[in-house]
Structure formats: structure tokens, C-alpha cells
């Protein structure tokens, strides 16, 4: 009898442990399970095929020599021979736009640099995507389109060499305050379009003339242990619109263990703009975006939804440390665009920022058109929890007849606000506040 009781007790303990383990599943904000795909995994470069070292195929170790054609020839050769890894050895290689083909990958050895030439004519105009619209625009320095299984790896550097472009941008702004980003004619650093199973690992992506890494209509992208930087000083040579990562109509994106410091948003969730943006097949939602274990220097927003965004669902920013950010979570609400920002969670954040939460209308370069059935924009199920942050303003949020805020949760917050401690949530429909200290 005692033996039966003991066995029953052990079985109960095992079942309880199993239930406990089951209860600890990692979940998206909407309650669905985060799949095992989102585990960080180091790429195996050796498994990607034959290595094509640039200097073994006619590319010179002369940092002043423009070698776009020679480098592209190596990429084309690898593609023609069934694919492989384009290896950038130690040294600096000056280039214009490069186009990767199916089966090819880029690996930058430590001390190896691809440096962008600072003349726009070396970045040909192509069918492209910028600022929430499909249009003709300049190619990036590194381009990948329609590829399955593309990777950029190694401890080397892709340097946009953007200073000439930055200075010319600010000169334009001196005589024309309404000069737009597109009119300034600048190349992005990396543009990856219509690709699946993409890995960017360990590389340094610096000094982009425009956006740093733009993902458009991609699925299953991992950006791991990468370093993103563009300067925010001095005023006449800071890097305008140098977003670190632009996620544009993408599904399943992991950003893990990165450092980000740029003169614009760190991670910007995009997807389309305009009064009929929700009906344009070129636009669409972003789903299942996980940003974790990152460090932030100066940025305009650690996580920004918009300004060109239509629908974002299951967006998580967690386990990060911030220093000198202007905003931690920024929800840009365009009056001219129907927007749905749903199930967004900010969890376990430490450090300092000017604003913790910022939700206001965004009207830069917007164009309101007549639409009888214009949907009301919404921000729904927004959660901030487990934060220990120093800031000037904690709650920089305002009401508007152009959007509705609902189901906001504030839980376990320890906030030091040096300028504005106000926390008026009366205009939010459904608010949960638990263990919040603002001093």
C-alpha cells in the first residue's frame, strides 16, 4: 500500500512539473506561442558552399580603386557555378551597388570592408520601395531580391561612406526646408526584398547614406549580434534618416543581441502610407517581430511603428538596455493613413531616454485625401511592463479624433521622470495599472 502511495505521489509530482513547464511557454502578446524558430542560432558558413575570396578572382587590395564590376563578376561567377560564399578578406574594397543572386552569400572576414562609393551615379535607378510606396529609386550598396536562404555574415564591415550625402542633404535643407528624403538622392546600405530565410550575423553596418538595412516583403529573417551605427553629430554632417532596421511588410523577424545607434529610428516597423494604403497590394501587415537582448545608444526611437505603417501585430521589444534614446516606444499616427497597431509589448527595459512612451499625430509630408469610409486608426493591446527607466517625460501621449487608444497595460514600472511625471490615461479605453512608481 505504501509503495502504491509513493508511486502515486511521484506521478503527481511529475505531472505537476510537466504542467509547470507547459505554463512557461514563450508567448506572443496575442497569446499564441512563439515558435522554436525564434531561437538564436549561429550560422554555419562552411555549409553554404564553395568560397570565392575576392582577391583570388582579380579584385585588388587597393582601397582607392573603384571595383564594382570586378566584385559583381565574382558574385555572378559563383551564381553560375551553383552558388557559394563571396568572401571579403582583410582590406577595404570600394564599390557601387552590388546584386546578389540565388545561392550566393556574403561573408566579411574581420578587418574586411566593403566601402560604398560616395557618388550616386554608381547606384542605378531600379524598381524599388521607399517610404511606404513602390517607385523608381536608387539601388542600395548591397541588394538581394527574390532569394531563398541569403546570408550576410562575419565580423567585417559594410561602410556606407555617407558623409558626402549627409552634408549635401543639410545644404539642401538650408535653402528648402520642405526638401524631402527622396529628393536628396541617397542610397541605402542594404536592401533585401522578397526573400525568405535570411540571416545577418555579426557584421558591422555603419555610416549609411540613408536607411541602413531595409527588409521588404521578407519572411523568416534573423539579425543577430550585428552592430549598427551612424553619427548624430555635428549638425552639418549628422546622418539623416539613417534608420538601423526598417521592417516593411514582413513576417517572422528576429533581432537579437545587436547594438544600435543611429540618427533616426533604431527599428522602424513600416508597411505603407496614404489614404488608401490598406487597399494597395504593395502594402501589408508586419507580424511576429521579436527584438531582444539589444543595446541602444542615441536613436530617435528604440521601437517605432510608422510613420508609413498600415497594420502591425505581435511586436515585442524585450530585455534591452537603452542610453540616450529620444523615445523607447514611439507610435506614429498619420492622419492620412488608416493604421492598426495591435498586440505590442515592451518588457524588461533598463536605462535612460527622453520619452518612454510617445503617441502623437505625425504630420510630416502627409497628404490627406477624401475617403468616405476612412477607417479610424487604432492602438490596441499595448503593454509596458518590468521597466526601470530614467527619462524626462514618462507618458507623452495625447488624444485625437483620428485614432483610438484601447487596452493599455502598465505593470511593474519604476520610472524616474525629471521633467514631466504626469500620467493621465483618461482618454484610453481600457487601462490596467499595477505596481507603477513614477517619481
Segments from the language model and where they lie:
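Short charge-dense sequence patches
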Residues: 21-30, 173-175, 206, 265, ...
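Glycine-rich beta-solenoid repeat tracts in large extracellular/virion proteins
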Residues: 97-100, 113, 117-118, 140-145, ...
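Right-handed parallel beta-helix
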Residues: 110-111, 148-157, 196-207, 219-233, ...
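Electropositive phosphate-/nucleotide-binding environments in soluble metabolic enzymes
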Residues: 65-68, 285, 378
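Extracellular "leader-to-stem" segments immediately downstream of a signal peptide or signal-anchor
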Residues: 1-6, 10-87, 92-194, 201, ...
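Mature catalytic domains of secreted/periplasmic carbohydrate-active enzymes
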Residues: 87, 119-120, 127-129, 199, ...
Amino acid at each position: 500500500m505504501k509503495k502504491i502511495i509513493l508511486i502515486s505521489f511521484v506521478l503527481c509530482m511529475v505531472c505537476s512539473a510537466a504542467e509547470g513547464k507547459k505554463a512557461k511557454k514563450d508567448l506572443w502578446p496575442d497569446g499564441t506561442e512563439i515558435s522554436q524558430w525564434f531561437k538564436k542560432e549561429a550560422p554555419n558558413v562552411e555549409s553554404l558552399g564553395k568560397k570565392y575570396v575576392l582577391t583570388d578572382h582579380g579584385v585588388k587590395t587597393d582601397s582607392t580603386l573603384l571595383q564594382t564590376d570586378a566584385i559583381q563578376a565574382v558574385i555572378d561567377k559563383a551564381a553560375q557555378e551553383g552558388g557559394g560564399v563571396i568572401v571579403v578578406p582583410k582590406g577595404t574594397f570600394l564599390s557601387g551597388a552590388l546584386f546578389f543572386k540565388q545561392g550566393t552569400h556574403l561573408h566579411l572576414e574581420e578587418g574586411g570592408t566593403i566601402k560604398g562609393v560616395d557618388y550616386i551615379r554608381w547606384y542605378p535607378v531600379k524598381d524599388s520601395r521607399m517610404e511606404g510606396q513602390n517607385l523608381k529609386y536608387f539601388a542600395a550598396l548591397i541588394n538581394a531580391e527574390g532569394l531563398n536562404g541569403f546570408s550576410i555574415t562575419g565580423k567585417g564591415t559594410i561602410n556606407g561612406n555617407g558623409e558626402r550625402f549627409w552634408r549635401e542633404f543639410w545644404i539642401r535643407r538650408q535653402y528648402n526646408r520642405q526638401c524631402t528624403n527622396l529628393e536628396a538622392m541617397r542610397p541605402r546600405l542594404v536592401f533585401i526584398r522578397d526573400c525568405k530565410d535570411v540571416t545577418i550575423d555579426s557584421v558591422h553596418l555603419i555610416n549609411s547614406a540613408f536607411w541602413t538595412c531595409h527588409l521588404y516583403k521578407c519572411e523568416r529573417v534573423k539579425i543577430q549580434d550585428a552592430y549598427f551605427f551612424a553619427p548624430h553629430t555635428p549638425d552639418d554632417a549628422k546622418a539623416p534618416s539613417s534608420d538601423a532596421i526598417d521592417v516593411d511588410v514582413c513576417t517572422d523577424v528576429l533581432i537579437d543581441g545587436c547594438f544600435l545607434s543611429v540618427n533616426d529610428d533604431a527599428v522602424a516597423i513600416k508597411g505603407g502610407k496614404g489614404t488608401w494604403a490598406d487597399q494597395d497590394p504593395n502594402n501589408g501587415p508586419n507580424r511576429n517581430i521579436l527584438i531582444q537582448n539589444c543595446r541602444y545608444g542615441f536613436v530617435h526611437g528604440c521601437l517605432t511603428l510608422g510613420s508609413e505603417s498600415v497594420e502591425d501585430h505581435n511586436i515585442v521589444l524585450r530585455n534591452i538596455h537603452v542610453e540616450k534614446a529620444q523615445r523607447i516606444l514611439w507610435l506614429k499616427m498619420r492622419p492620412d493613413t488608416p493604421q492598426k497597431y495591435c498586440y505590442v509589448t515592451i518588457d524588461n527595459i533598463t536605462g535612460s531616454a527622453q520619452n518612454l512612451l510617445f503617441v502623437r499625430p505625425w504630420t510630416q509630408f502627409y497628404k490627406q485625401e477624401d475617403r468616405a469610409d476612412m477607417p479610424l486608426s487604432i492602438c490596441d493591446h499595448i503593454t509596458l511592463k518590468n521597466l526601470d527607466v530614467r527619462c524626462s517625460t514618462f507618458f507623452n501621449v495625447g488624444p485625437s479624433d483620428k485614432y483610438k487608444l484601447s487596452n493599455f497595460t502598465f505593470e511593474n514600472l519604476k520610472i524616474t521622470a525629471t521633467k514631466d511625471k504626469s500620467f493621465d490615461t483618461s482618454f484610453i479605453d481600457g487601462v490596467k495599472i499595477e505596481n507603477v512608481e513614477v517619481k
